[in-house]
Design a protein with these regions (language model features):
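Low-complexity, glycine/alanine-rich, low-charge segments that are largely flexible
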Residues: 1-67, 163, 249-252
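Small-residue helix-packing and pore-constriction motifs in hydrophobic alpha-helices
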Residues: 48-98, 110-118, 130-142, 151-197, ...
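Tryptophan-paired
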Residues: 107
């Protein structure tokens, strides 16, 4: 394992460190100006740079990101209606707040949003805030404990169906039963002074956030993105996926290119 990590480090770090310079050379020093000028030829240049830098090997699936991104955007618009733009804005920041691309973020959010919105009696604005916090909590938990993010996402999706068997995936000191979730809610109530209802998904997600705040887990993803190689590379991978997806659908090339340069 250590040998493989060392090999990956030697192969990836020089590519990652040189990527920013290559992009700026192709685009000019001002990413905003670069984005304004981004046409087909420029977009092609950036895609070639990503491949040449070795990042393309890691994010090869991102070349098909466009169609998936369009589908995810449609799902968010259907669920969040007048507050869809709020959810999309959160998704654009996911590369650094949750360590995932906007598309991956929206796909996961969509999986539990119907139940979340229902628990808030149709308040899509509040649902967007709680969904965003839940996504950050999942990522922070994964980064803190080294748990597979898919296992944590499965747990959260289970909670949306009142299935608590995977609560222990979060490694917060609670077993995978309804009784243990009720214990978590009571502990969260002691910390926040707010009462949480196990039958209300918004309450469940909020209570988990309170417990993670108390354990010092909150903010781990953003901190690692700013201070560690693995965190910053994960952020760059997500930013690259965002850029390629937006090139494919004619979306926000300017903003996603700027994000990519910032993380490179």
């Amino acid at each position: 394992m250590a040998t493989n990590l060392a090999k990956a480090y030697v192969q990836i770090v020089p590519s990652a460190e040189g990527m920013k310079g290559m992009i700026e050379q192709a685009m000019g020093k001002d990413p905003e100006e670069a984005g304004e000028k981004a046409g087909n030829s420029i977009s092609s240049k950036i895609k070639n740079i990503i491949v040449a830098a070795g990042i393309g090997k890691v994010v090869s699936q991102a070349f098909t990101e466009g169609s998936a991104l369009e589908q995810s955007l449609g799902g968010i618009e259907t669920l969040y209606k007048k507050n869809a733009d709020k959810m999309k804005a959160y998704a654009k920041e996911a590369y650094k707040t949750s360590g995932v691309s906007a598309n991956a973020y929206m796909e996961n959010v969509t999986s539990f949003s119907a139940s979340l919105i229902s628990s808030l009696k149709g308040d899509t604005s509040k649902a967007a805030d709680i969904a965003n916090r839940a996504m950050q909590d999942m990522s922070d938990n994964s980064n803190k404990f080294g748990t597979n993010i898919q296992d944590i996402q499965n747990a959260y999706q289970g909670f949306a169906k009142q299935n608590y068997t995977m609560l222990d995936n979060l490694k917060l000191g609670y077993g995978g039963t309804k009784e243990e979730m009720q214990r978590l809610l009571k502990d969260a109530q002691k910390l926040s002074g707010q009462k949480y209802d196990i039958s209300n998904l918004a309450d469940v997600y909020t209570a988990i956030g309170v417990i993670q705040d108390n354990l010092g887990i909150t903010g781990t993803t953003a901190k690692e993105a700013a201070t560690t190689f693995s965190g910053s590379f994960g952020s760059m991978k997500a930013a690259a996926q965002d850029f390629l997806g937006n090139v494919a659908i004619g979306g926000d090339v300017t903003g996603t290119l700027s994000n990519l340069i910032t993380t490179a």
